[in-house]
From Swiss-Prot:
Entries under InterPro entries matching the protein: CFAP107 (IPR054709), CFAP68/107 (IPR037662)
Domain of life: Eukaryota
Annotated source species: Mus musculus
Keywords of the record: Cell projection, Cilium, Cytoplasm, Cytoskeleton, Flagellum
Stretches for region Mn 2: 97-109
GO CC entries: axonemal A tubule inner sheath; axonemal microtubule; sperm flagellum
Assembly, per entry: Microtubule inner protein component of sperm flagellar doublet microtubules.
The protein's name: Cilia- and flagella-associated protein 107
GO biological process: flagellated sperm motility
Entry's localization field: Cytoplasm, Cytoskeleton, Cilium axoneme; Cytoplasm, Cytoskeleton, Flagellum axoneme
Length: 196
């Protein structure tokens, strides 16, 4: 009986020596990994230097080339706003007629444009170009904005109105076809369903 009784060491279960495999992979983030990662500091004596800082040779008498900087900056920015939007120094509210509006609504009516164009052999173009003579007038307006503003600013009769209700108002009864209505009384030729 004395041989079967073994003494249990209490430290045996608390030490991880008896574990054969780890429960999780080393890539799994466990516990307070964010805080632990913040505490980590690499043991180095000096601040790390980048390759540029290591290989940089200072030139004390060097002056920056502002001309090449200006050229590269203007090349990256492209054409300025005034060259893209303004046309012959006209104010912007006078040439709002688009090419689509000119072609379909005004039917290419432009009194300033000559009737016939001539071929310019030096520039290899038909001159004058239509874009050189823009239509100077306010844009074509069919009253859509005013109609929508009148609808938007109208007094609200009820507070709970959806977009569907405001966009599609209810039609009057006279607008509906009478043939689509259900017959209120059964036809005399129809026999009632017998009930047993």
């Amino acid at each position: 009986m004395a041989m079967l009784s073994t003494s249990v060491v209490p430290e045996a279960f608390s030490t991880p020596g008896w574990q054969i495999e780890k429960k999780y992979s080393t890539k799994v983030l466990l516990g307070n990994w964010v805080e632990e990662r913040g505490k980590f500091t690499k043991a180095i004596d000096h601040t790390p230097q980048c390759i540029y800082r290591k290989e940089y040779v200072p030139m004390p008498d060097h002056r920056p080339d502002f001309v090449s900087r200006w050229y590269s900056k203007s090349k990256m920015e492209g054409l300025p706003y005034k060259h893209l939007i303004t046309h012959h120094q006209e104010p912007s509210h006078r040439y709002l007629i688009s090419t689509y509006d000119d072609h379909y609504n005004r039917h290419n009516y432009n009194p300033g444009l000559p009737a016939l164009r001539t071929w310019n052999g030096q520039k290899l173009l038909w001159l004058p170009e239509k874009s050189d003579f823009p239509l100077v007038a306010p844009p074509t307006n069919y009253g859509l904005l005013e109609q929508l503003q009148q609808k938007w600013l109208a007094s609200k009769t009820s507070l709970k109105e959806s977009i569907y209700t405001t966009s599609y108002p209810r039609l009057p009864v006279c607008a509906m076809s009478r043939r689509e209505h259900a017959i209120p009384v059964p036809h005399p030729r129809l026999q009632p369903i017998p009930r047993f």
